[in-house]
């Protein structure tokens, strides 16, 4: 099935046109959707329903949510829409498949980076067909991917305090503007640490599976798997030891989710 899903995702990327797309706000100037997001999502839902007829969908755009089936596709048609709208290459299509709430496969395609990440549960992770693994760098050597919870700016102070403490202990930090791109680059050994206050399931489902299959780990504030049906804090690392250190830092500032 992974081959059919990969082909569908690559074909959907043709709808990520560089010119002529329309932009509209979704409640705030920071949260936008483009006509390309909608076109990619419409194409993918049709193709994926044909691959697995008895399946539901949880998608970012237009409130598409049907969790009544054993199989559910979790789709972000363009993760990093703000980047996409500005012509920045850090954006991607993200598709995951869950069965009875357990992630089975993930495909993340970043066409302008020419990076196609794939994973199936228990079968490892690949980028452009080549096996990938997380790095073995220590926390002090680690590069942190993070963000300031752009759509909920009331969390910015707490985020900045956590990021400051992590930054003081690791090598450096980056913000690419796409959780899926960041988690996949971690899977490929390009960074070691990750923290984001609030992600939606479609932001992390596919890339989270890819990271795990590459030897990494991720969790929510409680240390369990991040929810794939509700918003979640997501922490991730290249090793359980580094993940535990991230969680201990977060919990110095945050004992429960503020949403």
Task: Give the residues covered by each predicted segment.
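Active-site-adjacent structural elements in enzyme catalytic cores
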Residues: 50, 58, 67-133, 209-212, ...
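Residue-level detector of anion-binding/catalytic polar loops
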Residues: 54-56, 172, 192, 217
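N-terminal subdomain of lithium-sensitive/metallo-dependent phosphomonoesterases centered on the IMPase/IPPase/PAP
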Residues: 1-78, 259
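Oxyanion/phosphate-interacting regions
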Residues: 1-7, 161-167, 183-259
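Acidic active-site catalytic centers that drive phospho-/nucleotidyl reactions
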Residues: 37, 60, 76-79, 83, ...
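Residue-level signal for inorganic ion chemistry
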Residues: 12-16, 37, 48, 81, ...
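Conserved beta-strand termini and adjacent loop/short-helix elements that scaffold enzyme active sites
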Residues: 26, 60, 176-178, 221
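Acidic beta-strand-loop-alpha-helix segment within the catalytic core
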Residues: 96-183, 231-259
């Amino acid at each position: 099935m992974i081959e059919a899903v990969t082909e569908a995702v690559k074909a959907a990327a043709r709808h990520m046109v560089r010119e002529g797309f329309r932009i509209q706000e979704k409640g705030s100037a920071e949260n936008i959707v483009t006509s390309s997001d909608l076109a990619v999502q419409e194409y993918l839902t049709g193709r994926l329903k044909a691959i697995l007829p008895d399946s539901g969908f949880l998608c970012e755009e237009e409130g598409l949510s049907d969790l009544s089936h054993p199989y559910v596709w979790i789709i972000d048609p363009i993760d990093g829409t703000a980047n996409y709208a500005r012509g920045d290459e850090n954006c991607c299509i993200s598709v995951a498949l869950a069965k009875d709430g357990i992630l089975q496969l993930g495909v993340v395609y970043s066409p302008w980076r020419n990076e196609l990440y794939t994973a199936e549960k228990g079968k490892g992770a690949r980028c452009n067909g080549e096996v990938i693994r997380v790095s073995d760098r220590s926390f002090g050597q680690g590069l942190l991917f993070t963000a300031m919870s752009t759509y909920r700016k009331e969390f910015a102070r707490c985020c900045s305090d956590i990021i400051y403490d992590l930054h003081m202990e690791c090598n450096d930090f980056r913000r690419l503007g796409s959780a899926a791109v960041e988690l996949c680059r971690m899977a490929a050994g390009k960074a070691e640490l990750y923290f984001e206050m609030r992600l939606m399931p479609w932001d992390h489902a596919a890339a989270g599976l890819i990271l795990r299959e590459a030897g990494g780990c991720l969790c929510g504030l409680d240390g369990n798997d991040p929810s794939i049906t509700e918003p979640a804090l997501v922490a991730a690392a290249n090793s359980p030891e580094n993940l535990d250190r991230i969680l201990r830092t977060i919990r110095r500032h945050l004992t429960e989710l503020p949403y």
